[in-house]
């Protein structure tokens, strides 16, 4: 009997993009269901994630798996026949988990990114600077490698790449530029975009810009 896999997501969510990429990389057949998380969350979402009521939600044979980092690891372990996301070496595995945690620690990258379009003045300048510093730290870890894990697209790449689709929006509304200080990271993003899984999961950047304009209007941000 084939496994039933459903992914509840919201197209602009970089967290949902992660889970979709992981499923695509493993070749898992799944049903994607778009959620209206702003206006009308579905009964299934509220049933499967009653604590946080957030996406993404991965439903495997009727059982929910929550939080994107956990979902990626779950997918890696359940569909373990090919293309492991995490290294087998314990130390390298620990390093990958550390950098994934760094990206999501207190949602620092997400929060800084949000501030680039939701704040003004000195707060905006500080957010832009902090955002670039986080990216430069990640770029330093990437080094000369094609991917964070070396020659192979893996866990940290999946965790980070969703933010890449938001870079144009961050730059437009924050009035700053990422590429001059993060050339290697931008090249990494373009490399990842050549993968079918990533190209399928990430939305068009101009669509993200339009979505941010809607958010600014919704929240009364000039």
UniProtKB/Swiss-Prot annotation:
<dbReference type="InterPro" id="IPR004045">
    <property type="entry name" value="Glutathione_S-Trfase_N"/>
</dbReference>
<feature type="domain" description="GST C-terminal">
    <location>
        <begin position="89"/>
        <end position="211"/>
    </location>
</feature>
<dbReference type="InterPro" id="IPR045074">
    <property type="entry name" value="GST_C_Tau"/>
</dbReference>
<dbReference type="InterPro" id="IPR004046">
    <property type="entry name" value="GST_C"/>
</dbReference>
<keyword id="KW-0808">Transferase</keyword>
<dbReference type="InterPro" id="IPR010987">
    <property type="entry name" value="Glutathione-S-Trfase_C-like"/>
</dbReference>
<feature type="binding site">
    <location>
        <begin position="67"/>
        <end position="68"/>
    </location>
    <ligand>
        <name>glutathione</name>
    </ligand>
</feature>
<dbReference type="InterPro" id="IPR036282">
    <property type="entry name" value="Glutathione-S-Trfase_C_sf"/>
</dbReference>
<dbReference type="GO" id="GO:0005829">
    <property type="term" value="C:cytosol"/>
</dbReference>
<dbReference type="GO" id="GO:0006749">
    <property type="term" value="P:glutathione metabolic process"/>
</dbReference>
<dbReference type="InterPro" id="IPR036249">
    <property type="entry name" value="Thioredoxin-like_sf"/>
</dbReference>
<comment type="similarity">
    <text>Belongs to the GST superfamily. Tau family.</text>
</comment>
<dbReference type="GO" id="GO:0004364">
    <property type="term" value="F:glutathione transferase activity"/>
</dbReference>
<feature type="binding site">
    <location>
        <begin position="13"/>
        <end position="14"/>
    </location>
    <ligand>
        <name>glutathione</name>
    </ligand>
</feature>
<feature type="binding site">
    <location>
        <begin position="40"/>
        <end position="41"/>
    </location>
    <ligand>
        <name>glutathione</name>
    </ligand>
</feature>
<dbReference type="Pfam" id="PF02798">
    <property type="entry name" value="GST_N"/>
</dbReference>
<dbReference type="GO" id="GO:0009407">
    <property type="term" value="P:toxin catabolic process"/>
</dbReference>
<keyword id="KW-0963">Cytoplasm</keyword>
<keyword id="KW-0216">Detoxification</keyword>
<dbReference type="InterPro" id="IPR045073">
    <property type="entry name" value="Omega/Tau-like"/>
</dbReference>
<dbReference type="GO" id="GO:0005737">
    <property type="term" value="C:cytoplasm"/>
</dbReference>
<dbReference type="Pfam" id="PF00043">
    <property type="entry name" value="GST_C"/>
</dbReference>
<feature type="binding site">
    <location>
        <begin position="54"/>
        <end position="55"/>
    </location>
    <ligand>
        <name>glutathione</name>
    </ligand>
</feature>
<comment type="function">
    <text>May be involved in the conjugation of reduced glutathione to a wide number of exogenous and endogenous hydrophobic electrophiles and have a detoxification role against certain herbicides.</text>
</comment>
<feature type="domain" description="GST N-terminal">
    <location>
        <begin position="3"/>
        <end position="83"/>
    </location>
</feature>
<protein>
    <recommendedName>
        <fullName>Glutathione S-transferase U21</fullName>
        <ecNumber>2.5.1.18</ecNumber>
    </recommendedName>
</protein>
């Amino acid at each position: 009997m084939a496994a039933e896999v459903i992914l509840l997501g919201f197209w602009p969510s970089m967290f949902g993009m992660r889970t979709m990429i992981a499923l695509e990389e493993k070749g898992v057949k799944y049903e994607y269901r778009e959620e209206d998380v702003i206006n009308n969350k579905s009964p299934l979402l509220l049933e499967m994630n009653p604590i946080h009521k957030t996406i993404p939600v991965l439903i495997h044979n009727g059982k929910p798996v929550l939080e994107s980092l956990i979902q990626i690891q779950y997918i890696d372990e359940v569909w373990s026949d090919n293309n492991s996301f995490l290294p087998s070496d314990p130390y390298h595995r620990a390093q990958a988990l550390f950098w994934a945690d760094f990206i999501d620690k207190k949602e620092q990258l997400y929060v800084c990114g949000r501030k680039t379009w939701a704040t003004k003045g000195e707060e905006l300048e500080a957010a832009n600077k902090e955002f670039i510093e986080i990216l430069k730290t990640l770029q330093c870890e990437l080094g000369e490698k094609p991917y964070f894990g070396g020659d192979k697209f893996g866990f940290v790449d999946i965790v980070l790449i969703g933010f890449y689709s938001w870079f144009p929006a961050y730059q437009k509304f924050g009035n700053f530029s990422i590429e001059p200080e993060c050339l290697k990271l931008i090249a990494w993003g373009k490399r990842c975009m050549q993968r079918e899984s990533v190209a399928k999961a990430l939305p068009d950047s101009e669509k993200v810009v339009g979505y941010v304009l809607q958010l600014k209007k919704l929240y009364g941000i000039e």
